[in-house]
Design a protein with these regions (language model features):
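Non-cofactor substrate-recognition interfaces
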Residues: 1-22, 101-107, 111-113, 120-588
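Charged, gly/pro-enriched flexible loop segments at helix/strand junctions
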Residues: 51-59, 394-400
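Conserved core architecture of multi-subunit DNA-directed RNA polymerases
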Residues: 6-13, 34, 38-42, 70-72, ...
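Active-site cores that bind ATP or allylic diphosphates and position pyrophosphate for catalysis
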Residues: 57-114, 122
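Gly/Thr-rich phosphate-binding loop signature of adenosyl cofactor/nucleotide-binding cores
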Residues: 47
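Metal-dependent nucleotidyl/phosphoryl-transfer cores and adjacent nucleic-acid-binding surfaces
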Residues: 43, 80-83, 132
Length: 588
């Protein structure tokens, strides 16, 4: 980690960057990590730290979940051309529903509900179809454009013109022949979304089924996020791969399409590498996103993305009504540049929404330059705040300082090295730890060897997650100093106010005490409004109801010759070592 310290120190001096090179803070040192633990313990005691099972942004390429502020870094959303599908969900005849006479007007009629998706790989996990209760829907008699079979389709009235031409309306059905480009259609019924709720349909891609799914899934549910801006006005719902889907399914008691492993754990149909599981037999082992394949694999003339193969299968099975390429903005991992998935994970969260109003209020006291960045980009971000996903499934970084019993009924959050050693002594007395064990490094794997004892005498194992590196950054105003070398400080029982009081007293002089917090001034690029600026602000407000900086200058981004953001990762940045050598520090 410190291999190039001398090189960077030399560059820093040439740039004239005013910083203490003799006493840097180093985020991997125990003293720094210990202070992060202390902050997290403060949050835990305030009820701001919790574990939840939710659908979150997840990067298969990086192997970890991502926070909302990571997903909103500049350049993370990129335009992609993906295969979109309007799928046909065939309604069941053997059901008791008030609309049955309108849905099926004769014994031969095949009636389907149309739902659009830009993520065909989620279709095997479909568990429900969501409608807007007040939206107007219609039933249209027509023919499937791929199988040429007669079909009656249900979709939103406002979106009929996306799929049907007015001049083809009411043309003679008897004149239609398989393969004709002109497809006749006719509206034969209309409904409100609330009328459709409860209708049941056949599972679209029945790779996984069980009694609970058959009884409680594959039905129409109401949802407040359904619109008629695009698609069909009916939302394909895969509860394990979308936050809105997850919420809507839970509110309507719809089970998720999952498999069960040998330990009894429920798992989605896509693994954490982004591949279909074996149960999805037609596509087992295939990556769900084209970008997860290597460049070499994608150059193969026979290569076809999984979404395309799904579209082909649905066409063959008379379950696709419209397939085309669709260009849209899609989130990518800021570390790997690969698309993310929305994925169900057990994660630890910081409840930033609990202090949202205070974050907004205190932001108005900060002097932003330009002001529009503070009121606009940063202010809007705070107004739409979600809880901070703290967990990271990685090996190197700051470990989460929480130990839990296997049943999850008891937990401890450790706030210092001394506090951990005291808990280890209790575990030794309980027979869970060897008396000779010493903790000298707070990283994995050493910290994972620590077993603690609960109040009821049960074993407690550390939660295996690390914490978001942006927490490391946002905690810098405190962690750069470490816990005060007092009994109260070393035990981790010091209050935030006492922490600042101690370091203010010991960083100045007798005649002029120091003032370590809040910072008088910080400066960074506009991309940090949802990065460092946010984490500084959030931690400061949650820890002791204060801003972290009084003044901030937020500059724009230096772009390359093509107008793209310069990035070390992309290799399009000007090399400062070369430019300083050639032109000197000032021009650079």
């Amino acid at each position: 980690v410190m291999k190039y310290t001398d090189v960077w120190n030399d560059l820093t001096e040439k740039m004239g960057y005013w910083v203490d090179l003799e006493n840097p803070y180093i985020t991997y040192e125990n003293e720094y990590i210990e202070t992060l633990w202390w902050i997290l313990k403060q949050f835990h005691e305030k009820g701001l730290l919790y574990k939840g099972y939710t659908v979150q942004p997840y990067s298969p390429a990086a192997g970890t979940g991502l926070s909302s502020h990571e997903l909103n870094q500049p350049g993370t959303y990129k335009m992609l051309k993906d295969t979109s599908i309007v799928a046909q969900f065939h309604l069941k005849r053997d059901q008791d529903h008030p609309l049955m006479d309108k849905v099926f007007e004769n014994a031969e009629e095949d009636t389907v509900i149309l739902a659009w998706t830009t993520t065909p790989w989620t279709l095997p996990s479909n568990c429900a179809l969501a409608v807007g209760a007040s939206i107007s829907y219609v039933k249209i008699r027509t023919f499937n454009p791929y199988t040429f079979q007669p079909v009656s389709v249900i979709l939103a009235m406002d979106l009929v013109s996306k799929y049907f031409k007015e001049e083809h309306k009411a043309l003679p059905f008897d004149d239609y022949k398989a393969g004709d480009k002109v497809i006749p259609w006719n509206q034969v019924a209309d409904f409100k979304g609330s009328d459709l709720v409860g209708l049941r349909y056949h599972q679209l891609m029945p790779y996984v089924s069980n009694a609970d799914l058959e009884k409680n899934a594959f039905r129409v549910i109401p949802a407040d996020f359904v619109t008629t801006e695009d698609g069909t006005g009916i939302v394909h719902t895969a509860s394990v791969f979308g936050a809105d889907d997850f919420r809507a399914a839970r509110e309507n008691n719809v089970p998720s399409v999952m498999i069960t492993d040998e330990k009894g754990n429920e798992l989605p149909l896509v693994d954490k590498q982004g591949r279909f599981v074996q149960e999805v037999s037609d596509f087992a082992g295939r990556f769900v996103k084209e970008e997860y394949y290597s460049d070499e694999e994608r150059k193969d003339p026979d290569f076809r993305p999984t979404d395309v193969l799904i579209a082909i299968k649905l066409k063959e099975d008379n379950k696709a009504f419209d397939v085309k390429k669709y260009e849209h903005s899609y989130p990518h991992c800021w570390r790997t540049d690969k698309p993310v998935l929305y994925y169900p994970l057990d994660s630890w969260f910081i409840k930033t929404t609990a202090v949202k109003d205070r974050l907004v209020e205190l932001n108005k006291t900060i002097n932003w330059k330009p002001e529009s960045t503070g009121t606009g980009r940063f202010g809007n971000w705070l107004e739409n705040l979600v809880d901070w996903n703290l967990s990271r499934s990685r090996y190197w970084g700051t470990p989460l300082p929480i130990w839990r019993t296997v049943d999850g009924a008891e937990e401890k959050c450790i706030g210092s090295v001394e506090g951990l050693r005291l808990e280890i002594k209790k575990a030794v007395a309980a027979g869970f730890m060897d008396a000779s064990f010493e903790i000298n490094d707070m990283h994995r794997p050493y910290v994972d060897d620590v077993i603690l004892v609960s109040k009821s005498g049960k074993k407690m194992i550390r939660e295996t997650d690390l914490i978001d590196v942006w927490f490391d950054s946002g905690a810098m105003p405190y962690a750069q100093w470490g816990l005060p070398p007092t009994a109260e400080g070393k035990s981790g029982n010091i209050s935030p106010e006492a922490f600042l009081e101690y370091w203010n007293k010991h960083t100045g002089s007798d005649s002029e005490p120091g003032s370590i917090y809040p910072a008088d001034f910080i400066a960074e690029g506009v991309d940090q409004t949802r990065g460092w600026f946010f984490t500084l602000h959030a931690i400061g407000v949650m820890l002791h109801d204060s801003i972290s900086f009084k003044n901030v200058v937020s500059n724009g981004l230096v772009l390359d010759k093509n107008g793209n953001k310069m990035s070390k990762r992309l290799g399009n940045a000007a090399d400062p070592f070369e430019t300083i050598e050639k032109y000197g520090a000032d021009p650079t």
